[in-house]
Amino acid sequence: MLIKLLTKVFGSRNDRTLRRMRKVVNIINAMEPEMEKLSDEELKGKTAEFRARLEKGEVLENLIPEAFAVVREASKRVFGMRHFDVQLLGGMVLNERCIAEMRTGEGKTLTATLPAYLNALTGKGVHVVTVNDYLAQRDAENNRPLFEFLGLTVGINLPGMPAPAKREAYAADITYGTNNEYGFDYLRDNMAFSPEERVQRKLHYALVDEVDSILIDEARTPLIISGPVEDSSEMYKRVNKIIPHLIRQEKEDSETFQGEGHFSVDEKSRQVNLTERGLVLIEELLVKEGIMDEGESLYSPANIMLMHHVTAALRAHALFTRDVDYIVKDGEVIIVDEHTGRTMQGRRWSDGLHQAVEAKEGVQIQNENQTLASITFQNYFRLYEKLAGMTGTADTEAFEFSSIYKLDTVVVPTNRPMIRKDLPDLVYMTEAEKIQAIIEDIKERTAKGQPVLVGTISIEKSELVSNELTKAGIKHNVLNAKFHANEAAIVAQAGYPAAVTIATNMAGRGTDIVLGGSWQAEVAALENPTAEQIEKIKADWQVRHDAVLAAGGLHIIGTERHESRRIDNQLRGRSGRQGDAGSSRFYLSMEDALMRIFAPDRVSGMMRKLGMKPGEAIEHPWVTKAIANAQRKVESRNFDIRKQLLEYDDVANDQRRAIYSQRNELLDVSDVSETINSIREDVFKATIDAYIPPQSLEEMWDIPGLQERLKNDFDLDLPIAEWLDKEPELHEETLRERILAQSIEVYQRKEEVVGAEMMRHFEKGVMLQTLDSLWKEHQAAMDYLRQGIHLRGYAQKDPKQEYKRESFSMFAAMLESLKYEVISTLSKVQVRMPEEVEELEQQRRMEAERLAQMQQLSHQDDDSAAAAALAAQTGERKVGRNDPCPCGSGKKYKQCHGRLQ
């Protein structure tokens, strides 16, 4: 009560922020007449003037009023569009490392031009981040004329672009691209082998569009660059045949409970567990298929990989549904983003799950991958010096933005008051009744000329509604991941009178639904439109626009509640843009996933007690409250998962930053010889310590072991035992010095042969490759540690503290291994004398010529052409890989002429 009273008197934090910013808006408005008097050249010249002032030490914040006034005036001249006062407020919020909540249709794209221009003046680059390539390209091309008018360069960063084009895009003042591409470029830059291969500059200012989608919905999904490991596709196929024999165990309180099943499914945590009965059956089936020996247990350490295959296959069959979680297109399993309904081409599930789904669908199984580099969006975006974002729905997640990203959320008021009617939810007993009610509502709305947008949470549901509409004879468009290319065109015309559009989740987000349809899209479809044609199109559009407004504006139908209230609000936000009329309603059933998993059983019990007849709906504040509570439960659970993921990833992130920083330093220097010398001393000291403990008696020394180790690991053949016999005065310290001196001498002789420059280049390459190889193994080890660390809780230990402690000791061990591997590799490298190299090269050329002649004798296309030619020449059978080579060298064929193929 007291807090409410204080807020009434002093205003909320949001009100105080906006009050402070409105004073700056008044200053910008006062500058408008002055800006209007400037010629185009004088307006363009302001950019150079601002940059000069910054170089002299002026603070960026001091330029806000004038810079925003310049952008507003330039926008009027280039686009014929003037920034509203609320857009100026939004621009200031975005410059202050905050999240700006701006409703759909309030012009977020135009608002973004203000902070983008201001922060680009520093010359350090601005990254505008969008959710897909289409929006990145659209926004870049739309805003390019404005920025170029003001003397700034614009770049677009798209997947598949060659490195030089990417470098050029990043060198621009303002770069547009997707969150995935920025993250992958960062990882690729940290795998580069020369400074020239890197494309990104230092990360300065990121302006994230649809910030909730990127920083919250996708926060649990790490970006991973992976490489293939050995082929195990056959095992996935064999295990996949077994899974259909297993029966799912239903809950005991459900109507379909039929005694004990073989596996149970936890839909909340998306996990599958074998029951005891299931374990017995699957072991029998594995033995029958010849995959496992009689009497063996699936849980024995020897079968750990087999258990991995069984779990992956079970999850693929029980938890992942075609046209909901993925689609199959051109013989390929493509993931569908659960948040946007869009396909994620090129993205694959890890831990063998993708291969298990491929086996289930009978498509070609691609190899499993090993992580080479990975980062979460949470940690990538926190690398920027300055981060800001905008969205239509952020207030529900304000706490998360604040606690994880240290970003405050400011709700920017709308330019015109919102008049959309949000109708109460209707709850039905069954899915079929709900779908029927939706069809009736659509018929009623379209009969009076009102356009309808139907939001579904999966492709499967969108196709179910589509089939029912087709049966009812209602014309409609479907907007889901299967029809990616037509997305913008369908959305643009979704505001036509009586138009019906079905959209999965938020597919098509970023394109406004204009009441009456988009006249711009109609003009764009004409080849060379005349002024008369354009006027006629505009006049026709105005008639349609007025008719739709009279019918009640765009009506939104939600076919079920999403896990997050924010995503429901995004769907609602498609209607009622810029003060237009509109309405929305959600239709639910007790069979919906959210209701089934999270709504208490008493809700369905209460509905039964009310004696509801088929087709009847319940509309009660209690039910609405129960649904809101269910959503809150899911949101808080998802927040905890993301928070926990971040706490664990922060440990890996500290190590990642240390490795990448070290790697970049290594890339930027040309001479690493000092580092090599320092490492050599450490490595030899540790190696000798293992066999000659410091300050120990000679009787405790293991000289044969030390000699063998030096020979095997460092190619250093030293007569240490002989030295000790011949030189009694040789003590521990002098012996250490002599071994190190000998290793340096051998290395210097190699350097004299190849030259210092070549040796420095080689040293750098070895260090980079060894670092990458060990870092890759370390990441895999960290993943394994992470998966099992929760079990430490049973021993009354804090899993997070244990993870920190163990990962730190693993990291320290990796750094020691790095030193050892580098010195071992450099010591073992064989350097040929120039004349030896020439002789070997001569032999190689002669063998290549001889092979070429032999290949001319044969016109076979297969890989055994050379072998067949040799067989023909010598009158012998076809030569096997392990047979002696027919050329008479005495070597095996695979090590002689077979190798040259």
UniProtKB/Swiss-Prot annotation:
Keywords annotated in UniProt: ATP-binding, Cell inner membrane, Cell membrane, Cytoplasm, Membrane, Metal-binding, Nucleotide-binding, Protein transport, Translocase, Translocation, Transport, Zinc
Binding-site residues, Zn(2+): C885, C887, C896, H897
Record GO cellular component, one term: plasma membrane
Superkingdom, natural source: Bacteria
Compositional bias annotation for Basic residues: 891-901
Cofactor: Zn(2+)
Free-text remark on how the cofactor is bound: May bind 1 zinc ion per subunit.
Predominant localisation class: membrane
Subcellular location: Cell inner membrane; Cytoplasm
Quaternary assembly: Monomer and homodimer. Part of the essential Sec protein translocation apparatus which comprises SecA, SecYEG and auxiliary proteins SecDF-YajC and YidC.
Similarity-based family: Belongs to the SecA family.
Function: Part of the Sec protein translocase complex. Interacts with the SecYEG preprotein conducting channel. Has a central role in coupling the hydrolysis of ATP to the transfer of proteins into and across the cell membrane, serving both as a receptor for the preprotein-SecB complex and as an ATP-driven molecular motor driving the stepwise translocation of polypeptide chains across the membrane.
The name this protein goes by in its record: Protein translocase subunit SecA
Species this chain originates from: Shigella dysenteriae serotype 1 (strain Sd197)
Classification of source organism: Bacteria, Pseudomonadati, Pseudomonadota, Gammaproteobacteria, Enterobacterales
Gene name, Swiss-Prot/TrEMBL: secA
